[in-house]
Amino acid sequence: MPDKFKRVHVVVMDSVGIGEAPDAAKFGDFDVDTFGHIAKHVGGLKMPEMGKLGLSNIREIEGIKKAEKPLAYYTKMQEASNGKDTMTGHWEIMGLYIDTPFRVFPDGFPDDLINQIEEKTGRKVIGNKPASGTEIMAELGEEHVKTGALIVYTSADSVLQIAAHEDVVPLEELYEICEFCRKITLDDPYMLGRIIARPFVGEPGAFVRTPNRHDYALKPFKPTVMDALKDGGKDVIAIGKISDIFDGEGVTESIRTKSNMDGMDQFIAVLDKDFNGMSFLNLVDFDALFGHRRDPQGYADALVDFDGRLVEVMEKLTDDDLLIITADHGNDPTYTGTDHTREFVPLLVYSPRFKNGGSELELRKTFADLGATVADNFDVKMPEYGTSFLRDLK
């Protein structure tokens, strides 16, 4: 068995699927292929760094040459859990199996839930649709200020958000309302991943969000590989929305990010730190800005930008580092609707230690194989699900 790695870096390209999963039809998805359809839409993707790692060796992506000698071990992973959302994907990556999917409400929330909120608060609810926070604030903020009605909205993720002006609904009241919403949406039929308080201030036409946002998430129902690492005295550095996804569980340091490029900046800064454990980065723009908005050109540009930053990442890695690049679900921007798509995700595993490059790994039947590999590397408690591929990395 080769020496273990001192640091493992997991990079999740949020929603960058690599082709329809065998059970996609069960999720209402037919002929979905995030990576493939984006590449086709733009007449080929220019991602030379991902190409060198072996992206097109997993399956050919237009514009990206197959590597004769891929630098990374490569395959794709199939999601086992019964869902295609961010929390399900990430929780499975870290060793959990999710039987009941988190619910999404692309047409707004049912009357029953809205009625409960109105009865409890004595305030009307306006909005009740998927929207970007800044847009709905501009659209309904003035009505909210005049009437005191709550702006309730969602996104393509499993989330209920409540926006309110701090002079109209005091923070304490807004937080109490969100706590009530959290309580009543823990189980079916709602099963929401997250409730978010979104306070704002200002005048019509110039409303701005304040830093007093508060998230009411669900904690993972069992310990994950992150908990095992933390309990084993290892570092778990969460970059981007990772800490939110796990509600802070198993995290030793959390670094917020403003965008994909800021995420890469923060990640590259973390690579300069001396630590023993895992860094875990989520790059959300692929999903939030381009997948849900069905913008294949914007998505393609973001992929090219990401590829361009990999040069800096590779320069910082030593033989003590293992880099794992993957995704958490698909979100084909050429598909109908605005929802995620049920897809395989890419898996690229690289270390400068691999002097002869990588080769194909077996197809992974669960994302949890990734978490199992991390646990195996650090000799901490193995997750219930997942099989380590550490021994296949020569």
UniProtKB/Swiss-Prot annotation:
Name by which UniProt lists this protein: Phosphopentomutase
Tagged with keyword Endoplasmic reticulum: no
Family to which this protein belongs: Belongs to the phosphopentomutase family.
Cofactors required: Mn(2+)
Recorded catalytic activity of this chain's protein: 2-deoxy-alpha-D-ribose 1-phosphate = 2-deoxy-D-ribose 5-phosphate; alpha-D-ribose 1-phosphate = D-ribose 5-phosphate
Gene this chain is encoded by: deoB
Gene Ontology biological-process entries: 2-deoxyribose 1-phosphate catabolic process; 5-phosphoribose 1-diphosphate biosynthetic process; metabolic compound salvage; nucleotide metabolic process
Pathway assigned to this chain's UniProt record: Carbohydrate degradation; 2-deoxy-D-ribose 1-phosphate degradation; D-glyceraldehyde 3-phosphate and acetaldehyde from 2-deoxy-alpha-D-ribose 1-phosphate: step 1/2
Subcellular compartments: Cytoplasm
SUPFAM superfamilies membership: Alkaline phosphatase-like, DeoB insert domain-like
Phylogenetic classification of the source organism: Bacteria, Bacillati, Bacillota, Bacilli, Bacillales
